[in-house]
């Protein structure tokens, strides 16, 4: 059973981060070292994303398919990062729509199972998991490609990392779907770059109570707050998302990408370099490995299994 950190109810290129040539990231904080060296081969793992080109081939549809809630696992994060790199390497592709095949769900957040520390106390898997999330965000937030999030329902916590990293967000209206970050309700703190994306979208006055209280908004309220750019019926979600992407593609790519860089490089730079990523990892590990958070996560997972 997959579980996610979610609601309890149900030719100028963008500067890209450089992957560490050694495949390692070591972080030191309070004398601790977290290794993010991967120890497993995920090459044979099932695909969690499907990619389909538009009729004219200049943009793609990326569809997340990881029922029941499209939880952002390390496998999902890695696959999305790799897929974006592959699309960027294709000179015919100018943008993509990121959507979901799971009814009523865009993404309900982080993979809770991967936030737990094993009985042996090894924090390596947790550190590797967060590193994969960092790199996924950088890939999506800094891509030269035009991006639109097509949101058919719940977009919560880690789901907002994906949606807010896109240039435009279109969300299904009138349904049960909710949009927001609720990490604080689990005793966690959203990463600074997620909080800043909320502020960039909604403004400080509106975003502050949403993030601090972990509030989740229906589509109409998310639209009013500026967190999403448009609402649409489910039957028109794909069409409206494609239309918004085509609006971006009407601008010459080099100009659009350069302006995107101007707007986003300051926030991207907070993780663009090794020091920033390791500092962010330290912050996450300090919180996620605390006894209170681990107890609360285990209690929540146990309650889900009883349902």
Label each region the model flagged.
Residues 2-99, 138:
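Conserved CoA-thioester-binding segment of acyl-CoA-metabolizing enzymes
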Residues 2-8, 14, 22-25, 36-37, ...:
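Intrinsically disordered, low-complexity segments enriched in small/flexible residues
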Residues 92, 100-138:
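Glycine- (often His-adjacent) and acidic-residue-rich active-site loop
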Residues 136, 150, 156-211, 240-244:
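CoA-thioester-processing core
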Residues 157, 214-221:
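Acidic, divalent-metal-coordinating active-site segment for phosphoryl/phosphodiester hydrolysis
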Residues 170-177, 228-275, 303-305:
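C-terminal long alpha-helix characteristic of the crotonase
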């Amino acid at each position: 059973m997959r579980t996610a950190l979610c609601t309890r109810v149900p030719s100028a290129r963008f500067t890209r981060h450089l992957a560490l040539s050694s495949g390692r990231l070591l972080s030191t904080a309070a004398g601790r070292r977290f290794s993010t060296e991967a120890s497993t081969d995920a090459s044979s793992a099932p695909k969690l994303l499907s990619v389909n080109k538009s009729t004219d081939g200049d943009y793609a549809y990326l569809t997340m398919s990881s029922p029941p809630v499209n939880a952002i696992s390390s496998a999902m994060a890695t696959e999305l990062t790799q897929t974006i790199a592959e699309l960027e390497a294709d000179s015919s592709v100018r943008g993509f729509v990121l959507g979901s095949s799971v009814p009523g769900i865009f993404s309900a957040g982080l993979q809770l199972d991967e936030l737990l520390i094993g009985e042996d106390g090894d924090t390596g898997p947790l550190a590797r998991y967060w590193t994969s999330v960092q790199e996924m965000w950088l890939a999506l937030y800094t891509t030269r490609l035009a991006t639109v999030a097509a949101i058919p329902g719940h977009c919560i916590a880690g789901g907002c990392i994906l949606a807010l990293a896109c240039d435009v967000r279109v969300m299904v209206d009138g349904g049960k779907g909710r949009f927001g970050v609720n990490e604080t309700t689990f005793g966690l703190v959203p990463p600074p770059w997620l909080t800043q994306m909320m502020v960039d979208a909604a403004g400080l006055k509106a975003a502050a109570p949403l993030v601090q209280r972990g509030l989740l908004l229906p589509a109409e309220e998310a639209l009013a707050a500026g967190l999403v750019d448009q609402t649409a019926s489910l039957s028109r979600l794909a069409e409206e998302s494609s239309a918004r992407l085509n609006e971006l593609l009407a601008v010459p790519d080099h100009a659009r990408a350069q302006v995107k860089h101007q707007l986003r490089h300051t926030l991207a730079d907070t993780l663009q370099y090794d020091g920033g990523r390791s500092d962010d990892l330290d912050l996450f590990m300090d919180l996620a490995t605390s006894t209170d958070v681990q107890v609360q996560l285990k209690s929540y997972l146990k309650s889900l299994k009883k349902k």
